[in-house]
Amino acid sequence: MVLLYSQASWDKRSKADALVLPFWMKNSKAQEAAVVDEDYKLVYQNALSNFSGKKGETAFLFGNDHTKEQKIVLLGLGKSEEVSGTTVLEAYAQATTVLRKAKCKTVNILLPTISQLRFSVEEFLTNLAAGVLSLNYNYPTYHKVDTSLPFLEKVTVVGIVSKVGDKIFRKEESLFEGVYLTRDLVNTNADEVTPEKLAAVAKGLAGEFASLDVKILDRKAILKEKMGLLAAVAKGAAVEPRFIVLDYQGNPKSKDRTVLIGKGVTFDSGGLDLKPGKAMITMKEDMAGAATVLGIFSALASLELPINVTGIIPATENAIGSAAYKMGDVYVGMTGLSVEIGSTDAEGRLILADAISYALKYCNPTRIIDFATLTGAMVVSLGESVAGFFANNDVLARDLAEASSETGEALWRMPLVEKYDPALHSDIADMKNIGSNRAGSITAALFLQRFLEDNPVAWAHLDIAGTAYHEKEELPYPKYATGFGVRCLIHYMEKFLSK
């Protein structure tokens, strides 16, 4: 879906289906955040008795014969002194939902007086564009009759005429092509999004962008590389596993390389340690880490960032069956480290472990960042609005946190408590794949950290179990797959690595 973007002054704007008018909240009452004609004030003045201008508040009104737009949306931005990028992002996401429900296809968005805010026009426009694009999206459905909302087709920002506005919107569109790819993959039936499908998507990206190369390992090649942990998880599945390696060379003269790893469990039944039905019903989303990496590569190649990045996706189902891997058995990873299986439902860390080992052997990484819907414990800890992350490097952790703050994709650093590491002890192997029934997210991260062995590489593990998929709309995300992480990581790489 291509969303047309333009800019105009108030007097020279074209007709549109709707106009979005901004308001501050002052002393619990709505205050105009921009100057408009008296004809518009006549439309909304009576509505202000029930509209306070608080963050994300909207009121839907109809215009009259004297207004260019026949539908008017009042949008609250909250107190002007408290407005943040996240405020703007969520407010315009909410406005987009209102506009689409009203079947608007063209919209004029009047900017507030930005001089009253603590940040720049560029920052405001970036978050406005992200808010609109985030909810100008329909998840795949399977109804006989299409019930999805119509898309916005044209947005005109009123009150500024500048080259920077068009540049910002084009950049955000490239970013959201990656976000939409991530969402679509997570939202689509698990029977369709198999490991082979993920491999096909990676091949498609490499075909679209000359800057991308792809390498696909099948089961035979996986076994040849001695990835015994990935091979173990794949044993019970009717679909074949794939190990996907994407390579982006944006700066051939640099030795700096970021490796992004995404957990690609295309459906997680729990294996022989079978999940209850209620816990299994959303498990097509267990490949959200893989989808995030693919979305990042789509945006990365489109934006042509001058950095070097490798993406690794270990992809398999975790199925129940007579050949499925078994609890109590021991399997050996790529580097020879052995793992006793305490639970077949702790499979994500196994396939990530082989991916980390592969990255260290072949990619010479400066840093490794992995994405995984890894633990229910993280959802219990931080809910669905914040992803927990672990890092062995303070600079990497600081930079990720800053990128998180600036994009509104909330990350919270969690501790790597070495005191908990003995919980992974096994009498018959180098380690177990689960700890005790406490600190589950931490022991999962400690498990992954062991596969770094003595390598000093900077590493971060993002547990996106809560943030990747929402069963109800939560601004600025739609219902179901969110695409969380794509914008944050692109911003991180652009700000801190593109030098």
Swiss-Prot record:
Cellular-component GO terms for this entry: cytoplasm
Database matches in HAMAP family: Cytosol_peptidase_M17 (MF_00181)
SUPFAM superfamilies documented for this protein: Macro domain-like, Zn-dependent exopeptidases
Catalytic reaction(s) noted: Release of an N-terminal amino acid, Xaa-|-Yaa-, in which Xaa is preferably Leu, but may be other amino acids including Pro although not Arg or Lys, and Yaa may be Pro. Amino acid amides and methyl esters are also readily hydrolyzed, but rates on arylamides are exceedingly low; Release of an N-terminal amino acid, preferentially leucine, but not glutamic or aspartic acids
GO biological processes: proteolysis
Cofactor or coenzyme needed: Mn(2+)
Its EC number(s): 3.4.11.1, 3.4.11.10
Active site residues per record: 275, 349
Family: Belongs to the peptidase M17 family.
PANTHER family per record: CYTOSOL AMINOPEPTIDASE, LEUCINE AMINOPEPTIDASE-RELATED
Intrachain disulfide bonds: none
Keyword presence, Glycoprotein: no
InterPro entries (UniProt xref): Leucine_aapep/pepB, Macro_dom-like, Peptidase_M17_C, Peptidase_M17_leu_NH2_pept, Peptidase_M17_N
Cofactor binding: number and manner: Binds 2 manganese ions per subunit.
Recorded name of the encoding gene: pepA
Keywords: Aminopeptidase, Cytoplasm, Hydrolase, Manganese, Metal-binding, Protease
Entry protein name: Probable cytosol aminopeptidase
Record bears the keyword Hydrolase: yes
Gene3D superfamilies cross-referenced by the UniProt entry: Leucine Aminopeptidase, subunit E, domain 1, Zn peptidases
NCBIfam families attached to this UniProt entry: PRK00913.2-5, PRK00913.3-5
PROSITE patterns reported in the protein's UniProt record: CYTOSOL_AP
Entry's Gene Ontology molecular function annotations: manganese ion binding; metalloaminopeptidase activity
Binding-site residues for Mn(2+) 2, renumbered to this chain: 263, 268, 286, 347
Main location: cytoplasm
Higher taxonomy: Bacteria, Pseudomonadati, Chlamydiota, Chlamydiia, Chlamydiales
